Regions:
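Structural motif
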Residues: 84-86, 186, 209-211, 244, ...
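Active-site metal-binding loops of divalent metal-dependent hydrolases
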Residues: 89, 215, 354
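Glycine-rich phosphate/adenosyl-contacting loop at the front of the ribokinase-like
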Residues: 2-138, 143-150, 344-345
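A short acidic, amphipathic alpha-helical/loop segment
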Residues: 220-228, 256-262, 371
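Conserved phosphate/ATP/ADP-binding segment of small-molecule kinases
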Residues: 36, 233-242, 248-335
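Conserved post-catalytic alpha-helical subdomain immediately downstream of the catalytic base
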Residues: 4-7, 11-13, 68, 308, ...
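Short glycine/proline- and charge-enriched loop/turn segments
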Residues: 99-108, 286-290, 336-339
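Conserved N-terminal subdomain of the carbohydrate kinase-like
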Residues: 80, 102-108, 128-212, 237-239, ...
Length: 412
């Protein structure tokens, strides 16, 4: 079982510089005796079999640096800050059915729509805000990969990650029934076949924002995320770039070692209420038993959840609640409620990825966390309003900022 207190004690012992590491050894021995060994990262259950060479990394040999040293006079000019996603991108095939067939049965789809999913909408949302955006994950070779590459080209999203030439990118069948249920059947492909060196070629510069989504934490690519997080260190103030992590309620599939490394890196955490409760439970954070009623205690519950979980994480935290807005907490500070923007719920898929993408884009432009959250709230609301086939569509920058201005004007 993951023990957040042991993780923080281990980090404190390492920072103290105890050369004989007696404290570290004692803590680790205690942790091993009290709980089972952390689970290892297991390969993705993929039906795509590699038959050729391994993934070919993109030509970006320089590693991230936190030295802060001035560049030599002959060094090339630094590029603008950009959003870099370590998430996975695949294709969803959405099928509307009356009901799921029984085993061996048959069902006809009323409507079938292929759409790019995973971290794609977050990437698109960042790019539409005018921020340079890059994808560092793996893309394969085949019809699904070609669909993704075309979308990247069309929207000026740069792919800087490995290209796997012996396997196509995977896809998901998403069955939407008339009762509102969603059933997923996944075929994992190149996107899930990463390793510890997957993100070694990512070239980070001051001001960049690295986005990590939960879809890259639960298969073989998780080893690459872990390696990246470990080299990023545990002091966010020493990093010239920011890390934004968006977990989901599927945290039980993230192994203990990776979760500990993520917590110790102290990124900016952003999630909805369900994922926040799941994370708090996994970390052993205290949860106040505040009933959610129409009388207004929802706000109190969200504030308490954000405060308790943020205190446990010792890192910036955003908890989203759709049109109700978001609750933001900085380490050592009070919880701030950022108003949302009411909209009619016509979507079948979450607007959380749009929120995360715009949040990252605004952080890359130098906005504060609260300011970035306000803009992201507006973008998520508009994306629901613009939904196509139940899928939120990221809005353009001008429309988002206009909504933010109208919201600010209405408060005065």
């Amino acid at each position: 079982m993951f023990d957040i207190r042991t993780a923080w004690r281990r980090l404190a012992a390492r920072i103290s510089g105890d050369t004989n590491q007696e404290t570290i050894d004692a803590i680790e021995a205690r942790n091993v005796s009290d709980s089972p060994a952390p689970a290892t990262v297991t390969p993705a259950p993929t039906t795509v079999e590699a038959t050729g060479a391994d993934a070919v990394p993109a030509p970006a040999p320089s590693a991230p640096t936190t030295s802060g040293e001035a560049a030599p006079d002959d060094a090339p000019a630094t590029r603008p800050a950009r959003v870099i996603s370590l998430g996975e991108v695949w294709v969803d095939i959405m099928m509307d059915v009356d009901s799921l067939p029984k085993a061996g049965g048959f069902a006809a789809s009323r409507n079938t729509i292929p759409t790019i999913d995973g971290s794609y909408r977050a990437l698109l949302a960042s790019r539409l805000m005018g921020t340079p955006t890059a994808h560092a994950g793996i893309i394969g070779a085949g019809p699904w990969a070609s669909m993704i590459r075309h979308a990247f080209y069309e929207h000026d999203i740069t792919h800087i990650g490995p290209d796997r030439l012996d396997a196509d990118t995977g896809f998901r069948l998403v069955l939407n029934d008339t009762n509102g249920g969603k059933t997923f059947i996944a075929t994992y492909g190149a996107e899930a076949q990463g390793g510890a060196d997957t993100f070694d070629g990512v070239d980070l510069q001051p001001g960049d924002v690295v986005s990590i989504s939960s879809n890259s934490l639960m298969d073989a690519t998780a080893a690459g995320v872990d390696a990246f997080i470990r080299q990023s260190g545990s002091d966010p103030d020493a990093r010239p770039y920011q890390i934004v992590l968006s977990p989901t309620s599927s945290l039980e599939r993230v192994n203990d070692r990776l979760l500990e490394d993520l917590v110790l890196a102290r990124p900016i955490w952003t999630c909805n209420r369900q994922a926040a409760v799941k994370l708090a439970d996994r970390l052993g954070a205290p949860l106040d038993e505040v009933p959610v009623t129409v009388g207004g205690t929802f706000d109190n519950e969200m504030k308490a959840l954000c405060d308790n979980l943020g205190t446990t994480l010792r890192a910036p935290l955003i908890i989203r609640a759709g049109a109700r807005g978001a609750w933001v907490r900085l380490p050592g500070g009070e919880v701030t409620h950022v108003d949302g923007f009411p909209t009619k719920a016509v979507h079948k898929r979450s607007a959380g990825t749009v929120h995360t993408g715009v949040l990252c884009a605004m952080l890359a432009t130098g906005r504060s966390l609260v300011e970035a959250t306000q803009v992201a709230n507006a973008a998520a609301s508009l994306s629901i309003e613009h939904s196509e086939n139940g899928i939120p569509v990221p809005p353009a920058r001008d429309e988002v900022l206009a909504l933010v201005e109208r919201g600010a004007a209405s408060e005065h």
